[in-house]
């Protein structure tokens, strides 16, 4: 998944950025509209008490499970804005990912010249005005970062705030729970001495069992994958009385951007989780945009099992680059 998604400000948002210091507005709550632009969802009018105004901001945020960017204007901050990135824990994972990956683009829209400090929140308790002010005051004592360091830090922090903590053993990527049927299928696969195939999918923020097949020859594995939806799969191959386990990740170019982002960001967490919880060690990997790449030769080569007919070639373990436009 790329480190940032480029979205554009709407006319309403651009107008706010031009006029916020000269109009009676305390804060603007910004949402991502149609997954292609930043738009002003709500504006909170300014009163004599910034703390009172922030209570209204908090009420607006807690009334929805949708993540949001909040720009707060404090007259005492030399016309600068305070940025609050709010990603509630119960938000949809796809929305969390979208906001996390677009935060750097949001900062560029506002421009660093207009931003004073930034703050991340994911729970109602973290939206307490006094706690936010305390956190922001600590940031003032830290050395300033270069712009590339700032964007990297912001992205990492926003990704961290979007993590679902259902399985603490997941250590990399976006953590998702694995349902019991998927865990049982993987456990059975580990002890199998046959050519068995387990295919997983992500449904409603949970990694679930899509298909479980027994005695599937390597030449037939590719036929079980979708041409439009991503999938994770584990395939066992008998070897000297035990089995080799191959990890297969197919992410078709036809899949939606959201699905590709979700699968890409949860892959490492899945592998970490099954290793920690089930003791499954992966003996080889095939990752591709096209299930047609999962040939018998590639499977045997990836698993380190020699084939009498295998040619000297390199296993496909990555995704193809988009083809350049044809020259006219």
From Swiss-Prot:
Q: Could you tell me which species this protein originates from?
A: Schizosaccharomyces pombe (strain 972 / ATCC 24843)
Q: In what residue span(s) does the ADF-H domain sit?
A: 1-137, 173-304
Q: Where is the composition biased (Polar residues)?
A: 306-318
Protein known as:
Twinfilin
* Superkingdom, taxonomy of origin: Eukaryota
Gene this chain is encoded by? twf1
- Which terms are listed as keywords in the entry? Actin-binding, Cytoplasm, Cytoskeleton, Phosphoprotein, Repeat
Give the residue range of the signal peptide. none
What is the predominant subcellular site recorded for this chain? cytoplasm
**A single GO cellular-component term on record:** cell division site
């Amino acid at each position: 998944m790329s480190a940032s998604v480029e979205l554009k400000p709407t006319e309403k948002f651009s107008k706010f950025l031009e006029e916020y210091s000269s109009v009676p507005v305390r804060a603007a709550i910004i949402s991502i509209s149609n997954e292609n632009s930043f738009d002003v969802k709500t504006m909170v009018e300014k009163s004599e008490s910034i703390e009172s105004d922030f209570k209204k901001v908090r009420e607006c945020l807690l009334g929805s499970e949708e993540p949001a960017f909040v720009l707060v204007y404090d007259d005492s901050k030399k016309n600068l804005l305070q940025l609050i990135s709010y990603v509630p824990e119960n938000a949809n994972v796809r929305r969390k990912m979208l906001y996390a990956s677009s935060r750097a683009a949001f900062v560029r829209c506002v421009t660093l010249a207009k931003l004073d400090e930034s703050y991340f929140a994911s729970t109602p308790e973290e939206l307490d005005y006094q706690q936010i002010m305390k956190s922001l005051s600590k940031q003032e004592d830290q050395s300033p970062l270069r712009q590339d360091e700032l964007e990297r830090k912001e992205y990492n922090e926003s990704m961290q705030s979007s993590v679902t903590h259902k399985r603490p053993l997941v250590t990399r990527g976006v953590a998702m729970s694995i349902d019991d049927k998927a865990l049982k299928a993987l456990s059975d696969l580990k002890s199998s001495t046959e050519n068995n195939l387990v295919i997983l999918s992500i449904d409603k923020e949970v990694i679930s069992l899509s298909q479980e097949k027994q005695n599937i020859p390597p030449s037939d594995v590719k036929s079980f994958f979708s041409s439009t939806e991503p999938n994770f799969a584990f395939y066992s191959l008998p070897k000297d009385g035990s089995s080799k386990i191959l990890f297969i990740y197919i992410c078709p170019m036809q899949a939606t951007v959201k699905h590709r982002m979700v699968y890409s960001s949860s892959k490492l967490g899945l592998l970490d989780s099954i290793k920690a919880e089930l003791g499954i060690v992966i003996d080889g990997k095939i990752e591709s945009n096209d299930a047609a790449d999962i040939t018998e030769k590639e499977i045997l080569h990836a698993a380190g099992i020699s084939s009498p007919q295998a040619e000297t070639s390199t296993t496909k373990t990555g995704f193809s680059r988009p083809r350049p436009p044809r020259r006219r």
